[in-house]
Amino acid sequence: MLQQRTIKTLTRAVGVGLHSGQRVELTLRPAQPDTGIVFRRVDLPEPVDIPITATAVVDTRMASTIGAGGAKVHTVEHLMSACAGLGLDNLYIDITAEEVPILDGSSASFVFLLQSAGVELQNAPKRFIRVKRPVEVREGTGQQLKWARLEPYHGFKLRFDIDFAHPAVDSTGQSAEFDLGEGNYARDIARARTFGFTKDVEMLRSSGLALGGGLDNAIVMDDYKVLNADSLRYDAEFARHKILDAMGDLYLVGKPLLAAYSAFRSGHAMNNLLLRELLAHEDAWEIVTFENERQAPAGFTQPVRAW
C-alpha cells in the first residue's frame, strides 16, 4: 500500500512576511492520517484552523491567501510547494501572524526544515486526485493571452512558459519543465527564488505589499540586469520559480494530483481557477489509491532525496 506521510517531530522557523514585513513564527507539527494540511492562527484570541482546499483560497493578489472563520494566512505557496515536493499529506502549521515567512524567497528552507524533522509513513492509503480528461482555463487574447491546463498523466509533471522582455530572463530561458518521477524537487526546483523589478517596488509598497522584500529573499532586477551579488542559482531560475509556485498553488486542492500541468503566463489566480474548474466537473477527475506500490507512479513511492 502506498501510504500517507507526515513528519516525525515538530520543527520551527522564524522570519518575516514578504508583503507584510511582520515577524512571524511557524511551528510545523505531525498530524494524524486523513487530517490533511491545516494552518492554525495561534496569535488570535481564539485560534482558528484553516484546512487547505481549493475553495479556501480567498485572495490571489501577488500570492495565494487562504482563509476561514474571518482569519487569513497569506503567501502559503512556497511552503505548500515544499509539502508537495516531499509528498506530505498531513501536517499542522501553527502561525503567529497573517503571512508565512518568506525566508530566502524559495522553498529550500522549508524543505530543509521538513526533512530535518523526518518523514514518517502512516497506516492509511495515500489518496490522489487523478485527472481523467483535459481541463483548461484561458484569459485574454493576443499579447494578453494566458492559460493553464491539466491533462491525464500517470504521475505529476509541469511545464511553464513565461514571457518577460528582459535581458536576464532572455539569457537564461523563458520556459522550464519538471517531472516528479524523473527529477529531484529539492535539487531541481526548491532553490528557485521569487523575483521582481525595481520599477515595481515603489508601486507595490504604496499598496502595502513587498514590505519585507529585499536582495536576501528575492531576485531583484533593474531594466538591464540582476542586482543580487550571488546572481542566479539555476538556468531558467525565473521559470523554475513559476513551477515552484504552481506546485504550491495546485497542492491547495488538498491531495496530490496525477496530471500533466502546462501553463503560459499563468499565476496564482489562474492556478486556483484551474483547480475550481477541475473540481466543478466530476467526470474530469477521480480519487484513487494504490494498494500495490509497484502500480503507483514514479516520484511518489520514495521520500525526496536531500540536495
UniProtKB/Swiss-Prot annotation:
Gene3D superfamilies referenced in this protein's UniProt entry, alphabetically: lpxc deacetylase, domain 1 (3.30.230.20), lpxc deacetylase, domain 2 (3.30.1700.10)
Cofactors required: Zn(2+)
One GO MF term: metal ion binding
GO CC, alphabetical: membrane
SUPFAM superfamilies found in the cross-reference section: Ribosomal protein S5 domain 2-like
Coiled-coil segments on the chain, per record: none
Alphabetic keyword roster: Hydrolase, Lipid A biosynthesis, Lipid biosynthesis, Lipid metabolism, Metal-binding, Zinc
Residues annotated for Zn(2+) binding in this entry: H78, H241, D245
Gene Ontology biological process terms, A to Z: lipid A biosynthetic process
InterPro entries on file: Ribosomal_Su5_D2-typ_SF, UDP-acyl_GlcNac_deAcase, UDP-acyl_GlcNac_deAcase_C, UDP-acyl_N-AcGlcN_deAcase_N
Family listed: Belongs to the LpxC family.
Record HAMAP family: LpxC (MF_00388)
NCBIfam families listed in its UniProt record: lpxC
Its biological purpose: Catalyzes the hydrolysis of UDP-3-O-myristoyl-N-acetylglucosamine to form UDP-3-O-myristoylglucosamine and acetate, the committed step in lipid A biosynthesis.
Protein's name according to its UniProt entry: UDP-3-O-acyl-N-acetylglucosamine deacetylase
Source organism (scientific name): Acidovorax sp. (strain JS42)
